[in-house]
Regions:
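Short amphipathic alpha-helix that is part of the acyltransferase structural core
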Residues: 2-14, 32, 37-48, 117-169, ...
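Conserved catalytic-core motifs of GNAT/GCN5-like acyltransferases
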Residues: 74, 89-105, 259-274
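Conserved active-site tyrosine of GNAT-family acetyltransferases
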Residues: 82-83, 252-254, 258
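A short, internal acetyl-CoA/4′-phosphopantetheine-binding micro-motif in the GNAT/acyltransferase core
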Residues: 40-53, 111, 206-218, 242-243
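Conserved beta-strand-loop-alpha-helix junction that forms the acyl-donor binding cleft
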Residues: 72-80, 240-250, 267-271
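Conserved acetyl-CoA-binding loop-helix of GNAT-fold acetyltransferases
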Residues: 49-62, 214-231, 251, 255
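Conserved GNAT acetyl-CoA-binding A-motif
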Residues: 63-75, 231-243
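A conserved beta-strand-loop-helix scaffold within acyl/acetyltransferase catalytic domains
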Residues: 20-41, 158-212
Length: 297
């Protein structure tokens, strides 16, 4: 179990929650990290100070203690070299993640015994995704609702997050802040987004993955409607992390013009406990303008 000593930061959420936000500061090392127990990984938010080898050793200890499969960070190009020098591997990029700069995903994967895999993260082969006709007209019987209510969105994640392999990507809020609810008869569908107005990007998720052929059309149209909402919010770049073998979900993103920009080894854990690789699908939807400045400046 992770423990954080006084003066080194404290857990922001209880150890019973799937995702915990922690802060660590000691000497010249200062960073934040998200511990995701459900998917056995940890994301580092680095403040670019301190010795990288000491940081790596710190995360190696957490990985062994917590039984983690993976530690990763999302950084600009110049910082990726420092992480690579201490044993992290580049698994791909998120174009436009920092609005005017791309992000690089640097990862360290561990064995079942908690030892770093020698040679870096194993490479994944891309599955074949069929090309399909875009769904530009609303499918018959589908009604849509735009949802921003935080309590409703938290409930959607509680009810559907595990089955949808949902994994929060940002700090402080562990659910989408905007979503489209679709309904056909008695069936509900949800697609959501975690937005970042400072950098103009959003992570999008299907919180109810397709279960049958007709679901694909419904979810694609809903995703298209969500992209329209994000564009109206001046979002420039969107991305999604999709399990490697979720071919139907991948087909939706492919139809919407997304491209694979990263292949992530053992990035998620299925409900039965099996590790699964993932692909990061990306698309630019708007112009990359300068970051928004706070109103008090």
């Amino acid at each position: 179990m992770l423990t954080t000593n006084p003066g080194q930061g404290a857990p922001k959420s209880s150890s019973h929650t799937p995702v915990e936000e922690h802060y660590y500061r000691r000497g010249d090392i200062d960073f934040c990290f998200l511990l995701n127990r459900q998917h056995a990984n940890l994301r580092v938010f680095d403040y670019r100070v301190g010795n990288y080898q000491q940081k790596r050793d710190f995360f190696d200890r957490i990985a062994r203690t917590e039984g983690l499969r993976k530690v990763f960070t999302v950084v600009e190009k110049q910082d990726s070299k420092s992480w690579r020098s201490v044993g992290f591997s580049r698994e791909g990029a998120i174009p436009g993640y920092f609005r005017t700069a791309d992000a690089y995903i640097m990862s360290r994967v561990y064995t079942d015994d908690g030892e770093p895999i020698q040679g870096g993260a194993p490479k994944l082969n891309s599955p074949t995704v069929a090309t399909r006709e875009p769904v530009e007209n609303k499918p018959r019987g589908l009604s849509l609702e735009l949802v921003r209510d935080e309590d409703r969105l938290k409930e959607v994640v509680r009810d559907n997050g595990a089955g949808a392999l949902y994994a929060p990507f940002r700090r402080a809020m562990f659910n989408p802040d905007i979503a489209i609810r679709g309904k056909v008869g008695k069936r509900e569908f949800w697609v959501g987004a975690e937005t970042d107005s400072s950098f103009g990007h959003a992570k999008v998720d299907m919180l109810t993955p397709p279960a049958k052929e007709s679901d694909i059309d419904h979810l694609e149209f809903m995703r298209r409607a969500l992209l329209d909402e994000l564009l109206a919010m001046e979002t420039a770049s969107v991305f999604s992390i999709v399990a490697f073998d979720s071919i139907d979900s991948a087909a939706i993103y492919n139809s919407l013009g997304f491209k694979v920009s990263a292949k992530l080894t053992d990035h998620i854990v299925r409900p039965g406990g099996a590790y699964a690789g993932a692909q990061l699908w990306h698309r630019r939807i708007g112009a990359s303008n300068a970051p928004r400045m706070p109103s008090f400046i």
